[in-house]
């Protein structure tokens, strides 16, 4: 409750000015579940311009949606006016937002009952839709009619399955049936928004449970490159997913599990950045080599510690060994390398030109590569004169 206490002065100030105000959303849910608290959000009957007048230190980030960031005690908090939404367009966004003075009207537009609980600054719960009961039953239940909620915003179906993965809850029967019925509406949603939810699914503590729900509801059949992947997705549920430390590892393992032969094409369809695609593909390529042989100095040096650590964790999951010392061994080997990157070499192309008395050309880069490999393999000490002597001894100068 300590973090809520820091923000409670905002609620107290709003109430002193004659407005209602409550803590709402995921932070209240996580407090009840006893999970780490994320961002703390506040809902109020005050209109955005009233909030801005009361709190001079503010950032009007989303006035059309009624949201103002208020800075209090050095911390930013989202303060949003109670609102209701009109008909939705394209199954993803409301055609208009109306500000209201009713907490109930605000809460009833939310996706799931566990996310529709408000809390006073004293810690009293305002639970109009049995959200606490759903949490106690470990169930994900829509607020009101599931069909209506999913037709308003089809992304809520992915959010529901994401919560299965992150919380370990189960989909309530009618909620699950509605996902099966309206799953096709997900095709109206921008893939970038789906990717965010799917990544949270893959990195959730209960990822296997989430993937099973993805299959059982048939929602996977409306996702890019997964339309015919039921058996491959079920294969992915046979592994443990709790040893990964990054989203890169989770995606690499997922692509391995489903046997994706063209990972770059798959990831581009999911709108990943070039950097992220490069890292995921690098992990997959490293695993392919790792399956054939153990780490050696050259492989580790060329791979780099960042990719090597991730690849080793994924490899451990693949062979179902889960030995934490394997990554420690990789780290020890890497730190014992004579050099860890080319910039650490104590010789340059100019040195080679001076020693050989030859014109510049491709031979310089080729020679530097040979020296680099020799240093990494321990065949020559990384000192300028020792390198020159080694080159002369190998008749390379």
Swiss-Prot record:
**What is the role of the protein in this entry?**
Catalyzes the addition and repair of the essential 3'-terminal CCA sequence in tRNAs without using a nucleic acid template. Adds these three nucleotides in the order of C, C, and A to the tRNA nucleotide-73, using CTP and ATP as substrates and producing inorganic pyrophosphate. tRNA 3'-terminal CCA addition is required both for tRNA processing and repair. Also involved in tRNA surveillance by mediating tandem CCA addition to generate a CCACCA at the 3' terminus of unstable tRNAs. While stable tRNAs receive only 3'-terminal CCA, unstable tRNAs are marked with CCACCA and rapidly degraded.
The protein in question is named: CCA-adding enzyme
Coiled-coil spans are none
What organism is recorded for this protein?
A: Bacillus cereus (strain ATCC 14579 / DSM 31 / CCUG 7414 / JCM 2152 / NBRC 15305 / NCIMB 9373 / NCTC 2599 / NRRL B-3711)
Q: What InterPro entries does the record point to?
A: Bact_CCA-adding_enz_type3_sf, CCA-adding_enz_C, CCA-adding_enz_firmicutes, NT_sf, PolA_pol_head_dom, PolyA_RNA-bd
More info? A single active site specifically recognizes both ATP and CTP and is responsible for their addition.
- Lineage, top ranks: Bacteria, Bacillati, Bacillota, Bacilli, Bacillales
The entry marks the following residues as binding Mg(2+), namely 39, 41
The cofactors required by this protein are: Mg(2+)
Q: Which family is it part of?
A: Belongs to the tRNA nucleotidyltransferase/poly(A) polymerase family. Bacterial CCA-adding enzyme type 3 subfamily.
């Amino acid at each position: 409750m300590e973090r809520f206490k820091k923000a409670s002065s905002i609620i107290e100030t709003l109430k002193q000015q004659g407005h209602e105000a409550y803590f709402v959303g995921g932070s209240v849910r996580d407090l009840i579940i006893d999970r780490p608290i994320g961002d703390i959000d506040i809902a109020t009957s005050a209109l955005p311009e009233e909030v801005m007048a009361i709190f001079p230190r503010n950032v009007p980030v989303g006035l059309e949606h009624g949201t103002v960031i208020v800075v209090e005690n050095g911390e930013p908090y989202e303060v949003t006016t109670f609102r209701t939404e009109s008909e939705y367009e394209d199954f993803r966004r409301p055609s208009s937002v109306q500000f209201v003075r009713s907490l109930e009207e605000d809460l009833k537009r939310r996706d799931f009952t566990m996310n529709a609980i408000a809390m006073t600054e004293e810690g009293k719960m305002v639970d109009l839709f049995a959200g606490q009961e759903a949490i106690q039953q470990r169930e994900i239940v829509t607020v009101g009619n599931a069909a209506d909620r999913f037709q308003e915003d089809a992304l809520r179906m992915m959010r529901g399955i994401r919560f299965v993965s992150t919380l370990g809850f189960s989909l309530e029967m009618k909620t699950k049936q509605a996902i099966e019925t309206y799953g096709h509406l997900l095709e109206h949603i921008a893939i970038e928004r789906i990717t965010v939810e799917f990544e949270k699914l893959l990195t959730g503590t209960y990822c296997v449970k989430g993937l099973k729900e993805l299959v059982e509801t048939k929602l996977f059949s409306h996702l890019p490159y997964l339309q015919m992947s039921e058996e491959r997705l079920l294969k992915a549920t046979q592994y443990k997913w709790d040893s990964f430390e990054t989203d890169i590892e989770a995606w690499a393992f997922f692509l391995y599990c489903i046997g994706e032969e063209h990972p770059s094409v798959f990831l581009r369809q999911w709108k990943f950045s070039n950097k992220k695609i490069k890292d995921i593909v690098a992990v997959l390529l490293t695993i392919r080599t790792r399956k054939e042989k153990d780490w050696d100095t050259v492989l580790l040096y060329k791979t780099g510690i960042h990719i090597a650590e991730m690849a080793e964790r994924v490899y451990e999951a693949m062979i179902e060994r889960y030995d934490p010392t394997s990554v420690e061994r990789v780290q020890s080997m890497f730190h014992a390398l004579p050099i860890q990157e080319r910039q650490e070499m104590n010789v340059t192309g100019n040195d080679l030109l001076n020693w050989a008395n030859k014109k510049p050309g491709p031979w310089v880069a080729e020679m530097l590569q040979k020296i680099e490999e020799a240093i990494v393999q321990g065949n020559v000490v990384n000192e300028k004169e020792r390198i020159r002597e080694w080159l002369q001894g190998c008749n390379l100068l």
